[in-house]
Amino acid sequence: MGRITSSRSQLIGDPRHHSLLASKFINCLMLDGKKTTAQRVFYDALEEIGKRHEGEETPIEVFEAALENIKPYIEVRSKRVGGASYQVPMQVNKARQQSLAIRWILAAVRDKKGRPMALKLADELLAGFKKEGAAYTKRENTHRMADANKAFAHFAW
């Protein structure tokens, strides 16, 4: 008998760019069901990126590239073997890569204080695009942990 899988709800692209990724990001950015506020913050951040970025990429391309740069490809997971817990490096599937990248960006932005959310988000996305910033550092630390625990890779299940 096969495992029953739940069906995922269909995501509709965001109103301006028709991007599923942007829509997902806005949903994660939203607090207390205030989607309009989350959209305003996201689009203001994209406008700020448009003003600050001197390249041929559009702001939505900068956003997508930043997210791509922050996605982790490998992470460590705890596995118990004979009374000891090992940090086993494992590959991350696409959906988890995306959700981790979004969560790390938002955590980095929410940790910064004293400026409007849209400006902080624009800063972090531009930093991610340039392979810098707190979210990118988090990704690098995750990869470093996996590399340090390579000896336990044979425990992968």
UniProtKB/Swiss-Prot annotation:
PROSITE patterns: RIBOSOMAL_S7
GO biological process: ribosomal small subunit assembly; translation
Domain of life: Bacteria
One Pfam short name: Ribosomal_S7
Keyword entries, A-Z: Ribonucleoprotein, Ribosomal protein, RNA-binding, rRNA-binding, tRNA-binding
GO cellular component: cytosolic small ribosomal subunit; ribosome
Listed GO MF terms: mRNA binding; rRNA binding; structural constituent of ribosome; tRNA binding
Assembly description: Part of the 30S ribosomal subunit. Contacts proteins S9 and S11.
Family: Belongs to the universal ribosomal protein uS7 family.
Function description: One of the primary rRNA binding proteins, it binds directly to 16S rRNA where it nucleates assembly of the head domain of the 30S subunit. Is located at the subunit interface close to the decoding center, probably blocks exit of the E-site tRNA.
Name of the protein in its database record: Small ribosomal subunit protein uS7
Name of the coding gene: rpsG
